[in-house]
C-alpha cells in the first residue's frame, strides 16, 4: 500500500473509534512505571512466573503480532521497550462494561505507530520475555502515517535530519545522543556554578556584530527603524559585565554566523563563553581541562574514549605547545627565523602551503601553515598557545614574545574545541586593532569586525586583568557521543527546504510565460512575467533566492505537475 492509502485507511479507523465513543486523541494517562523501571525491577522473574503487582504504562506500538485470541505488542517509551501480553478472555472480562468487543477492536483498529496506554500485572512468558499481562488498554493517540520499514543507511541521512521526529522514534541511539547532550550542558553549568560563576544572558539582537571574525545575519527592527545583527559571539557584552564589577560570568547559548555549512559548521550553533577577572590564559587552560574531564567522566564514566575509530585519552594534564613549535615540528619551517615577508612567503610556497601570496604578514603565513599542515594531526588533546597578533584582535600582547598574543586553542581529534585569551584590557590598543578590522570591513572583508564604540567606552572605565574562554558545545558533544557530523548533535539542523532548487526553466517571450521545474519534480507556470525578470534570473548568483524574492507571490501561476 502507498502512504496515501495507509493514511486513508487509518483515517477510517479514526472514524470507527469515534463511532464507538472512543476519543482517538486522549487528554492524559497516569503511568506507574516506565519500561526500563519494569525491566530492572522484575529482572529476576523466572520464565512462566507472574506477580500480581498492578502497573500502568504508556508508549508507542513498535511491533504487533496478532493471533486468534492472543496478541503481542512491543511498546516503547522514552526509556526502552516492554512486551504487552494481550489475551482475549482477560481483556474482555476486564473491559466488558467499557467495550464488549475490546479485544477485536484492539486487533482491528490499532497499528504500529499508535500510542497506547495499558494496565495489568507482570509476567515473564515461557519464552522468557518480560511482559505486562494486560487487563485494560486505551488508545491514546491514533497515528496516521506509517513508520519507515528501513531508516538506517546513508541514503536516508537527509530525511533523518529533515524529519528528526521520525528519526527519534525509530532510532533509540539518536535519543541517547540528545540525552547525553543535555547531560553535558547541565554538567558544564553545574561545574561553573559550583565555582561561583554566574550565568547572565546577553542580547541576541545587536547594533554592532563583534567578538569574532564572522559574517553576521542581518535583520531590521521596524519600530526603531534600524538594522540589527544576530550575535556572532557573546564576548563583548560579557566583558562589559566584568567592567561592571562581576568577577566570574558565563553564558551558554546560541550563536549565529552567516557562513558555510559542513560536517563541522552550522549557521546556528551553541557555545559557552566564560570570563574570569584577575585570571589569564593559563588559568583558562586549567579551567578548560577541568570542565571537559569532569563532564566526560560524569557522562561517560571514563576519560578513555573512541571517536570515529581513534582512541583519545582525556586524562590531564594535556599537552601545551606553541604554534611556532608545532609548525616547525610538522613542516620544518622555523618562523622565528624569518626576517622579511618575502622570505616567509618563499618558504611557505616551497612547503606547499596554499594562500601564501595573499598573506600580508608573517603571522598570517604562520597561521596558514598551521591550518594546512598541523591542525588535522592533533588527535590527542593539545593546547596550541601563543598566536600571531594579526589573527587575534581581542587578545592581550604576549608578555615576553613580541608580535604574539596570549591565546590558546584546544584541539582534539583534529578540530578546534575551545579558544581562549588573556583578554585585552588596554582601551587604546583595542581601538587601534578594531579600527584596523573596520578598515578591512570597509574594503569588503565580510568577516572583519567593526568598531563597537560603547565597548571601547566600557574599557576606558577600566577592566581588570581577565581570562576569557569559549568552548564549542556542538563539537564537544560530537566528541563525547562519537558523532561524525555536527548535524547529528543538533536536534533540528538548518536545511534547505525540499523542492527549493530550480532544476530548469524556460521563458516564452510572446506570452511572457516563465515555466520553472524544481528538483522535487514540481513544474509551475508563471504568467505575465516581464523579460527583465527572466534576464535578472539568468544572472542571479542564487536562482532559488531570486525566485523567492522576486517571482514567488508576485505573479499568477498554475501548477502543471
Swiss-Prot record:
Class of the enzyme per the UniProt entry, highest EC level: ligase
E.C. no: 6.1.1.6
The reaction(s) this protein catalyses: tRNA(Lys) + L-lysine + ATP = L-lysyl-tRNA(Lys) + AMP + diphosphate
InterPro entries associated with the record: Aa-tRNA-synt_II, aa-tRNA-synth_II, aa-tRNA-synth_II/BPL/LPL, KTSC_dom, Lys-tRNA-ligase_II, Lys-tRNA-ligase_II_bac/euk, Lys-tRNA-ligase_II_N, Lys-tRNA-synth_II_C
CDD domains with a match to the protein in the record: LysRS_core, LysRS_N
PROSITE patterns from the UniProt entry: AA_TRNA_LIGASE_II
Gene Ontology CC terms, in alphabetical order: cytosol
Cofactor annotation comment: Binds 3 Mg(2+) ions per subunit.
Classification via Gene3D superfamilies: Bira Bifunctional Protein, Domain 2 (3.30.930.10), Nucleic acid-binding proteins (2.40.50.140)
Protein's cellular compartments: Cytoplasm
Cofactors demanded by this protein: Mg(2+)
Predominant subcellular localization, coarse grouping: cytoplasm
Keywords: Aminoacyl-tRNA synthetase, ATP-binding, Cytoplasm, Ligase, Magnesium, Metal-binding, Nucleotide-binding, Protein biosynthesis
HAMAP family the record matches: Lys_tRNA_synth_class2 (MF_00252)
Assembly description: Homodimer.
Record-given protein name: Lysine--tRNA ligase
Provenance organism: Nostoc sp. (strain PCC 7120 / SAG 25.82 / UTEX 2576)
